[in-house]
Amino acid sequence: MINFNELIKVGNFNKSHGIKGEISFVFTNNFFFKGKNSFLICEMEGIFIPFRVESYRSISNSTVLVKLKNINTIEQTKLLTYQEVFLPKKQSAENTKLNYFSWDHYIGFNIIDEKNREIGSITDIDKSTINTLFIVEKESKEILIPTANEMIVTIDEKRKIIYMKLPVGLL
């Protein structure tokens, strides 16, 4: 039996997609997307149930369409709609060892642009939109910067710096 204390929340299922059992999954950290996960866990009627991932495809920085094994109809996906999704903490720890961190890991890091200018310090992460955003404080102002992988040049874990190529007009 799966115990809640052994799990970490990684996101929520959202709505059904199509008629063949796909469901959108919004993940709140990148353990799922970057790791090698063969199943996701949901609580159903007080019991944690693993669902084998048959396939998935990315539709944004924080959303994938997931096809679960033996979930083949809209009716079946509706049972999972808006359910919290978990992974075993052990699996998350393995992903972390491979440098697959939650975006929250980067709170406190500084952002430096391609011209070597300090943009500011990450104070929070906004996961309320399709695109996850760094909330960066600079001179008492809040700047929202997308966490898009194509904008991240490199990450210096030791110095807590994220080097980014920012689009013109963002600042």
From Swiss-Prot:
PRC barrel domain segment(s): 97-170
GO CC annotations on file: cytoplasm; ribosome
Keyword Chaperone (UniProt): yes
InterPro entries given in the database record: PRC_barrel-like_sf (IPR011033), PRC_RimM (IPR056792), RimM (IPR011961), RimM_N (IPR002676), RimM_N_sf (IPR036976), Transl_B-barrel_sf (IPR009000)
Family stated for the protein in its record: Belongs to the RimM family.
Known role: An accessory protein needed during the final step in the assembly of 30S ribosomal subunit, possibly for assembly of the head region. Essential for efficient processing of 16S rRNA. May be needed both before and after RbfA during the maturation of 16S rRNA. It has affinity for free ribosomal 30S subunits but not for 70S ribosomes.
Pfam family of the protein (one): RimM
Main location: cytoplasm
This protein's domain notes: The PRC barrel domain binds ribosomal protein uS19.
GO biological process terms held by the UniProt record: ribosomal small subunit biogenesis; rRNA processing
Protein name per the record: Ribosome maturation factor RimM
Organism: Azobacteroides pseudotrichonymphae genomovar. CFP2
Keywords on record: Chaperone, Cytoplasm, Ribosome biogenesis, rRNA processing
Keyword set includes Cytoplasm: yes
Gene that produces this protein: rimM
Subunit structure: Binds ribosomal protein uS19.
GO molecular function list: ribosome binding
Compartments reported by the entry: Cytoplasm
